[in-house]
Every structure is written in C-alpha cells, then in structure tokens.
UniProtKB/Swiss-Prot annotation:
Database matches in Gene3D superfamilies: Glutaredoxin
Keyword Nucleus: no
UniProt cross-references to Pfam families, sorted A to Z: Thioredoxin
Gene Ontology CC annotation, any one: chloroplast
PROSITE patterns membership: THIOREDOXIN_2
Protein name: Thioredoxin-like 1-1, chloroplastic
Thioredoxin domain ranges (all copies): 56-202
Gene Ontology process terms (BP): cell redox homeostasis
InterPro entries, per database record: Thioredoxin-like_sf, Thioredoxin_domain
Annotated source species: Oryza sativa subsp. japonica
Source species taxonomy: Eukaryota, Viridiplantae, Streptophyta, Embryophyta, Tracheophyta
Role this protein plays: Probable thiol-disulfide oxidoreductase that may participate in various redox reactions.
Active site: residue positions: C125 (nucleophile), C128 (nucleophile)
Electron transport in keyword set: yes
Family: Belongs to the thioredoxin family.
C-alpha cells in the first residue's frame, strides 16, 4: 500500500487506477494560490509573481484628494481665520493699521494738510466692533481723509503714554494745527464723529508743515522704555528762562543774571513811575 501511495496510484475496487494523492495535493495548492490572488489581506492586495506558488504582497496607496476639494478646504480655513478679525473687514484705501509708535508719529507728519483720524480700538471691545462698519462707510464717503487704526491690545504701552484709557476713542489731526479734536463715541453718539468730520474736513490752505503729535506726547513716547521710539526736542521751543537756569547752574560756567519775578517787576515799575512823577 505504501509503495502504491509513493507511486502516485492506487487500484480501485472496480479495477480502475484512481487519481494519486500527490496530484491532488498539487491541484489543491494551485487552487489556493488562485484564491489568494483574488482576496485582499488586511489592506494589502495579493499578487503572485513568483514560481512555485509564492505570493508577493503589495501595499495599496491611498488616492489623493481632488484639487478642488483641497482648495475648498484651504478657503474654509482662511475664511474662519478672517471672520475673527472684524477690524479688517470693509477696509477702504484710506484706512490702515498702525504698526508702532514711530509709524504713528511719521504718518501724522507725512500727512501734510490732510485731516487724519486716529481710531483707537480693541478686538474685544463690543462698542468698537459695532461702530467699525459705520467708520468704514464714512471713510468711503471721505476719501481725502486718512484713517489710522491703533490696536489697543498690541500697543497698550503706547496708548498709556498717549493717555488713552477709554474705547472706542478718536483723535483728529490737521496740518499745522496738530490735534484739533479728541473724544470717545459709540453708535448712539455717532453724530459727534460726523460733526467733527464736517468741521475739520473741508479743503483749506495749510499755513505750515504738519505738526503731528504734541510735544508732551512725543516726550512721553520717548521716555517709555517699552517702545523703540527716539525723539530730540526742538531747541527753539525751550523756554529762555530754563536755558538761563541751566547755564547758570553749570559748574564753571559764566554767571548770568536770573530773570526777575513778577513781584520784582511790579515793584520796579512802581518806583519808576514815582520817580518820573517827581515824588
């Protein structure tokens, strides 16, 4: 029997030679290989490329998203980010945000005789957010006026130096006059803003270069260590009495007479009048 099995044939009861077990095993292996080619295994597709029934597994690659879906996803993220920055909506060509104290000072000086409105706001200020669309409309109707936005959260130290403690807050500057108006208003008091715009906005001939920030404001910004702002006071604006006191107090400097007080001048004037009258 063992020899018959090894020879691959066995006699049937009817005298016919049956199919050998070895042949059956070969057919079974071939069927298993064919089945393996058509059945995926754990995210892999099986493909037989080797002889003797060996199976090679190739990894399935994920299909890339269509370009239109990727673009839509990016636009959605961009829209969400922009929706949170309400102060950037409805901006007009004559509206821009201030980046630093130096930027504010230079912008006012370079505006010439143009009316400049400085808008102090905060992203978390509900009144500022409600008023912003109306300010943008007024900017659109008055293209000759320059609107400068100052973000209070980004420039707290600068706002402290400029004595801005309430929001929304506005300051109007015009040419050689410098600051011509300063106030706070909301939607309920928007008429105050419109009146100031009508009063200081009409075209007129300037009598000198733009003044910009006040001298005291420039000094306050210069001594603020949190700001990268430098300013040299104009020597022409230093009072004569202060200059005399500094020179007289300087060690080794020439002695200069101090200016007379108001009382001394009054007494001297009285004596002169008495002498002239002959008393």
């Amino acid at each position: 029997m063992a020899e018959a099995l090894c020879s691959g044939s066995v006699a049937s009861p009817c005298g016919e030679v049956g199919v050998g077990f070895a042949a059956g095993l070969v057919r079974g292996a071939a069927a298993a290989a064919a089945l393996a080619e058509s059945v995926p295994i754990g995210g892999y597709s099986s493909k037989s490329t080797f002889p003797s029934g060996r199976v090679a597994l190739t990894e399935r690659k994920a299909r890339p998203l269509p370009r239109n879906l990727e673009a839509a996803h990016g636009q959605m993220n961009l829209t969400i980010g922009k929706a949170m920055r309400w102060w950037e909506k409805c901006l007009q060509p004559n509206m821009r945000e201030i980046e630093s104290a130096q930027d504010l000072a230079d912008s006012l000086l370079n505006a010439g005789d143009k009316l400049v409105v400085v808008d102090f706001f905060s992203p978390g200020c509900g009144g500022c957010r409600a008023l912003h669309p109306k300010i943008a409309q007024l900017a659109e109707k008055n293209p000759e006026v320059l609107f400068l936005q100052v973000n209070y959260e980004k420039h707290k130290s600068m706002c402290y130096s400029l004595h801005v403690h309430v929001l929304p807050f506005f300051r109007f500057y015009r040419g050689a006059q410098g600051r011509v108006s300063s106030f706070s208003c909301t939607n309920a008091t928007i008429k105050k803003f419109k009146d100031a715009l009508a009063k200081h906005g009409p075209d007129r001939c300037g009598l000198g270069p733009a003044k910009g920030l006040e001298e005291s404001e420039l000094m306050a910004l210069a001594i603020n260590r949190d700001l990268n702002f430098t300013y040299t006071p104009n020597q022409d604006l230093v009072p004569i009495a202060d200059a005399l006191l500094k020179e007289a107090a300087a060690p080794g400097g020439p002695w200069l007479p101090l200016p007379a007080t108001a009382t001394q001048l009054f007494i001297q004037g009285s004596e002169n009048s008495l002498l002239s009258s002959g008393r």
